């Protein structure tokens, strides 16, 4: 079985026998219609795109209620197009890995063209210009990571041929402006708060610079700032899409699916003709479009207003997912775990995050109305985190912890303050923060060194806890005041809100020698 069999019509009975879901629509007809009247271009040809936005559109096409595909453009790693898209007629296989052990396999046929978004690829760039000049184009979208929205001063000086993604997109928007100032929606689908504002700021930066340099008329800047023409909606996306997994690769090979190998590009992108991803997914988008949009609600997208998108983001980041991740990462690293799913089999750790979420954070959760916080956190604890197919590691999640604590825990503490709630209800959140001081020593619960994940404040914060030793006996913990009063790290001065002394007391227990992390965790979780 090969993906190219689908175009050739050479489909054996094996596809159905092995449980592979094939497209229910006329792939060639959709391709022709999309080429003639494109509606959607997506920048970022990585795994998350194929596993989520492209798969949603595939579901919409399978419904028979839509007839246009998506054109993908890659602005960074062009090998992905050459090696993971074009040899397979832009088809891919989505392998959905469920926590129950069940596996769904679906051919994704919604991507009709794959293009390299750079001037050095003349034909591809000319095609992108043609697409951006098309009145039918409704939306361009992105999964290029938060770093992809960066604007480098040097790139602003390259005129109308910048090399960074946002510069290229602005150049293409200029082509659309010249074609009649046609309307378009510019939609980030990256996992970062207020993502539409990041795209907007970048586009405005390039357009403003070009006007200043006399390269484009002032009307172009007015065009991208005119919300009747161009909009930059916010969205909240949530789905884990790891690298191609060796276990999945073997399972596909055993099925007789031949396109089962991993591709590693020179830029160290890990891709493949298949994508493995978790079953749970959320995509909530601000419904602010100027030229219509593809009906992605047919594939499960939730459209709402900007305020609701923001509430969903806060629900996830401050209560229902991210705080649990950070709690597990700090303690998981100290207890020697390398897989989040394995941590979920540890009763202390599982109870730890359950009680943080349900007992301590949920009383101040931001309820968006359109998604139930209890259902969301239930899916996290019961399906997502225990999923053995998701090889996520506490070491990865612990990266940049100093930049995450304020939003993931500080906001909850501030909400308790603002509402006049009893902060004695906060026990396990203080235990997470006490654990951070112990984590910074770089010693696990057996007092063996472990590699601390990268963090911009690591050396500075380690210097604060350096006087402390992991050993029994009396020692002076007053150095911790310099840590727990840091509003830049925790979002609040923990002493000013009445939690500093409680956290110090817990830290003393965690520093009491080998086995103290486990003993302290067990004590407080059981008592809670």
Regions found by a protein language model. Give the residues of each.
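Substrate/ligand-engaging "lid" and interaction regions
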Residues: 1-43, 47-528
């Amino acid at each position: 079985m090969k993906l190219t069999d689908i175009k050739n019509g050479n489909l054996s009975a094996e596809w159905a026998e092995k449980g592979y879901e094939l497209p229910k629509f006329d792939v060639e007809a959709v391709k022709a219609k999309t080429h003639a009247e494109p509606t959607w271009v997506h920048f970022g040809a990585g795994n998350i795109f194929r596993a989520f936005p492209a798969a949603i559109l595939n579901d919409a096409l399978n419904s028979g209620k839509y007839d246009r595909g998506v054109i993908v453009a890659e602005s960074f790693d062009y090998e992905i197009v050459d090696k993971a898209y074009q040899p397979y007629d832009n088809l891919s296989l989505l392998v959905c890995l469920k926590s129950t052990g069940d596996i769904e396999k679906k051919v994704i046929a919604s991507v009709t063209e794959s293009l390299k978004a750079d001037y050095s690829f003349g034909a591809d760039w000319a095609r992108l210009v043609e697409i951006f000049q098309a009145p039918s184009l409704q939306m361009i979208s992105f999964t290029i990571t938060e770093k992809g929205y960066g604007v480098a001063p040097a790139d602003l000086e390259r005129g109308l041929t910048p090399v960074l993604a946002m510069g290229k997109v602005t150049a293409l928007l200029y082509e659309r402006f010249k074609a009649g100032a046609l309307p378009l929606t510019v939609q980030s689908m990256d996992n970062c708060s207020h993502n539409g504002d990041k795209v907007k700021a970048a586009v405005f930066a390039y357009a403003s610079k070009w006007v200043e340099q006399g390269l484009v008329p002032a009307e172009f800047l007015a065009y991208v700032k005119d919300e009747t023409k161009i909009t930059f909606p916010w969205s909240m996306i949530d789905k884990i899409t790891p690298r191609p997994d060796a276990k999945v690769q073997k399972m596909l090979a055993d099925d007789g699916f031949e396109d089962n190998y991993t591709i590693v590009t020179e830029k160290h992108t890990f891709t493949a003709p298949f994508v493995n991803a978790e079953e749970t997914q959320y995509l909530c988008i601000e419904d602010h479009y100027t030229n219509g949009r593809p009906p992605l609600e047919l594939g499960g997208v939730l459209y709402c207003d900007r305020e609701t998108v923001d509430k969903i983001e806060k629900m996830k980041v401050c209560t229902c997912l991210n705080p649990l991740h950070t709690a597990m990462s700090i303690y998981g690293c100290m207890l020697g775990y390398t897989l989040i799913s394995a941590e979920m089999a540890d009763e202390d750790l599982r109870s730890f995050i359950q009680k943080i979420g349900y007992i301590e954070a949920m009383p101040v959760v931001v309820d968006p109305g359109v998604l139930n916080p209890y259902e969301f956190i239930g899916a996290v604890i019961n399906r997502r985190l225990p999923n053995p197919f998701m090889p996520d590691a506490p070491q990865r999640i612990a990266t940049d912890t100093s930049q995450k604590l304020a939003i993931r825990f500080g906001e909850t503490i501030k909400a308790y303050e603002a509402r006049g709630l009893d902060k004695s209800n906060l026990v396990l959140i203080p235990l997470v923060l006490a654990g951070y001081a112990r984590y910074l020593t770089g010693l696990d619960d057996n007092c063996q060194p472990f590699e601390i994940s990268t963090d911009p404040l690591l050396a500075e914060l380690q210097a604060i806890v350096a006087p402390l030793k992991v050993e029994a006996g009396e020692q002076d913990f007053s150095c911790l005041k310099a840590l727990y009063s840091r509003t830049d790290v925790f979002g609040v001065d923990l002493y000013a809100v009445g939690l500093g002394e409680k956290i110090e007391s817990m830290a003393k227990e965690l520093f009491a020698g080998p086995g103290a992390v486990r003993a302290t965790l067990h004590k407080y979780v059981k008592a809670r």
